[in-house]
């Protein structure tokens, strides 16, 4: 059996490194629901606790961590709005980090994905599944309180506008957004760098201070993660 060691991340609360025998490492989180996997991820017992290896090819947030992310606004007790929750892969790791005292509103538009997301949420009391359209935040406004962080991973053209509209509705002043930007979803005719700069500018025009832009290569092609603070 391959021995895997677990060490806390140098800076990020609730994030760990799973260190393999050959020296490779991947992010990990302590499992809020021991014994349960979400997407076939590896479970590791270490010092009496169970950890879930966080696969960067399955999660853009894990890819950001692998690629040197500097700002990580999640912590125990955080209130999070997750736009584009899909089947719950990344949201489940966020759930591990914010623990029982946090809450994560998981908005997903596709009913087929929702069928996969709901069983994940049923096992994790801090995850609330919401069938909704991220472009129409008023549709789920009665269900969502003010949050500390908005994480967005949606493949559609107006990504900066969507996260800004949601921030106006739900994000506390001084809160943070993390946006996974896919250039080809926004404009296939432009170079990715140009698309990313356009999205940064749109965020700044809507009251955000962009803190960092993280290239997601080699895990995702033509993607970046943008972390920004909201000043309203």
Swiss-Prot record:
<feature type="binding site">
    <location>
        <begin position="108"/>
        <end position="109"/>
    </location>
    <ligand>
        <name>S-adenosyl-L-methionine</name>
    </ligand>
</feature>
<keyword id="KW-0489">Methyltransferase</keyword>
<feature type="binding site">
    <location>
        <begin position="153"/>
        <end position="156"/>
    </location>
    <ligand>
        <name>S-adenosyl-L-methionine</name>
    </ligand>
</feature>
<comment type="function">
    <text>Involved in pre-rRNA and tRNA processing. Utilizes the methyl donor S-adenosyl-L-methionine to catalyze the site-specific 2'-hydroxyl methylation of ribose moieties in rRNA and tRNA. Site specificity is provided by a guide RNA that base pairs with the substrate. Methylation occurs at a characteristic distance from the sequence involved in base pairing with the guide RNA.</text>
</comment>
<dbReference type="Pfam" id="PF01269">
    <property type="entry name" value="Fibrillarin"/>
</dbReference>
<keyword id="KW-0694">RNA-binding</keyword>
<dbReference type="InterPro" id="IPR020813">
    <property type="entry name" value="Fibrillarin_CS"/>
</dbReference>
<protein>
    <recommendedName>
        <fullName>Fibrillarin-like rRNA/tRNA 2'-O-methyltransferase</fullName>
        <ecNumber>2.1.1.-</ecNumber>
    </recommendedName>
</protein>
<dbReference type="InterPro" id="IPR029063">
    <property type="entry name" value="SAM-dependent_MTases_sf"/>
</dbReference>
<keyword id="KW-0808">Transferase</keyword>
<dbReference type="InterPro" id="IPR000692">
    <property type="entry name" value="Fibrillarin"/>
</dbReference>
<dbReference type="GO" id="GO:0008649">
    <property type="term" value="F:rRNA methyltransferase activity"/>
</dbReference>
<dbReference type="GO" id="GO:1990259">
    <property type="term" value="F:histone H2AQ104 methyltransferase activity"/>
</dbReference>
<comment type="similarity">
    <text>Belongs to the methyltransferase superfamily. Fibrillarin family.</text>
</comment>
<dbReference type="GO" id="GO:0003723">
    <property type="term" value="F:RNA binding"/>
</dbReference>
<dbReference type="GO" id="GO:0000494">
    <property type="term" value="P:box C/D sno(s)RNA 3'-end processing"/>
</dbReference>
<keyword id="KW-0819">tRNA processing</keyword>
<comment type="subunit">
    <text>Interacts with nop5. Component of box C/D small ribonucleoprotein (sRNP) particles that contain rpl7ae, FlpA and nop5, plus a guide RNA.</text>
</comment>
<dbReference type="GO" id="GO:0008033">
    <property type="term" value="P:tRNA processing"/>
</dbReference>
<feature type="binding site">
    <location>
        <begin position="89"/>
        <end position="90"/>
    </location>
    <ligand>
        <name>S-adenosyl-L-methionine</name>
    </ligand>
</feature>
<keyword id="KW-0698">rRNA processing</keyword>
<feature type="binding site">
    <location>
        <begin position="133"/>
        <end position="134"/>
    </location>
    <ligand>
        <name>S-adenosyl-L-methionine</name>
    </ligand>
</feature>
